[in-house]
C-alpha cells in the first residue's frame, strides 16, 4: 500500500536508492508485470510476499491462491521482463517440507528432498493446513518453473521455521503476521478460555538471521538451486507463556 511504502521510505536516508511499487493483488494475472517492466534492469529479486494470517473464513482465496499465483506471476514477469536478472530468492517455509500434522511427530526426519504432500482438497479443511500446504504448492511451482522454462536467473529457496523478532516499522495491531498473531493470541489467554495456538510448537528463527541469509543467498553462487532450512532452536507455547509471566507477572497467564 502507499501508506506502507511511504513509511518504509521515511526510514531511509535522503540519498538512499529506494523506490516502491504497489502490487494490489498477488493472485491477479500479470500482477507483477508493470513493476518489473518499470525496473527491468534489476539483477536480484526477493519474493517474500505470501499471506501470513490464520484469521479467515476463506482459506482458498486468502491463503492458497495468493501464495501459488503470486509465485507464478512474479516468476513469469521476471523471466519476461528482466534480462539482466541473476538470481531470485524465494522465501518459502519449513511448512513446505512437512505438514502441520507431521510436525507433531517426535520421530519426524527429513532432508532437502522432503515435501509436505498435503493434497489441495485437504488443504481447504482449515487455515493452518492451508497455510502449510500453500508453501509447498508455491515452492514446487517455483522449482518446476526453473526446470521447465530454464530462465536466465538462478533460484535459491529459504525455508525458515517460525520467525520471531522486531518489526522495522510501526504496524496495525489488528493485522499481525502469523508469528506475532500467535503471541498476541497467547497474551489474551486467561484461566478460563483457550487459544488457537496453545498447543503449537516448532522450530524458530530470528528475523535478523533471515535477513542475513537473504543477502548471503545473492552473494554465494554455491547456494543456487538449494533449499535452505533455517532454525535457531525449538519452542513451545508454554515456553513463550513462561517468558511473558517472568517479565510481566501482572498478566497472570496460565
Protein language model annotation of sequence segments:
Residues 151-152, 165-181, 217-227:
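Glycine/proline-rich active-site loop of Rossmann-fold NAD(P)-dependent oxidoreductases
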Amino acid at each position: 500500500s502507499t501508506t506502507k511504502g511511504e513509511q518504509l521510505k521515511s526510514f531511509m536516508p535522503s540519498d538512499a536508492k529506494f523506490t516502491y511499487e504497489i502490487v494490489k493483488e498477488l493472485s491477479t494475472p500479470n500482477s507483477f508485470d508493470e513493476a518489473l517492466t518499470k525496473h527491468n534492469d534489476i539483477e536480484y529479486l526477493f519474493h517474500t510476499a505470501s499471506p501470513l494470517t490464520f484469521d479467515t473464513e476463506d482459506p482458498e482465496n486468502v491463503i492458497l491462491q495468493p501464495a501459488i499465483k503470486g509465485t507464478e506471476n512474479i516468476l513469469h514477469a521476471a523471466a519476461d521482463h528482466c534480462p539482466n536478472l541473476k538470481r531470485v530468492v524465494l522465501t518459502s517455509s519449513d511448512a513446505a517440507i512437512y505438514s502441520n500434522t507431521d510436525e507433531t511427530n517426535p520421530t519426524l526426519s527429513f532432508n532437502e528432498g522432503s515435501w509436505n504432500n498435503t493434497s489441495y482438497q485437504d488443504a481447504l479443511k482449515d487455515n493452518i493446513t492451508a497455510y502449510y500446504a500453500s508453501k509447498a504448492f508455491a515452492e514446487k511451482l517455483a522449482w518446476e518453473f526453473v526446470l521447465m522454462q530454464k530462465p536466465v536467473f538462478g533460484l535459491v529457496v529459504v525455508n525458515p521455521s517460525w520467525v520471531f523478532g522486531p518489526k522495522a516499522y510501526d504496524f496495525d495491531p489488528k493485522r499481525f503476521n502469523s508469528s506475532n498473531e500467535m503471541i498476541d493470541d497467547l497474551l489474551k489467554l486467561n484461566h478460563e478460555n483457550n487459544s488457537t495456538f496453545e498447543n503449537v510448537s516448532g522450530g524458530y528463527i530470528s528475523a535478523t538471521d533471515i535477513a542475513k541469509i537473504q543477502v548471503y543467498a545473492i552473494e554465494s553462487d554455491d547456494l543456487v538451486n538449494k533449499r535452505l532450512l533455517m532454525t535457531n532452536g525449538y519452542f513451545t507455547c508454554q515456553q513463550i507463556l513462561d517468558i511473558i509471566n517472568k517479565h510481566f507477572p501482572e498478566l497472570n497467564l496460565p
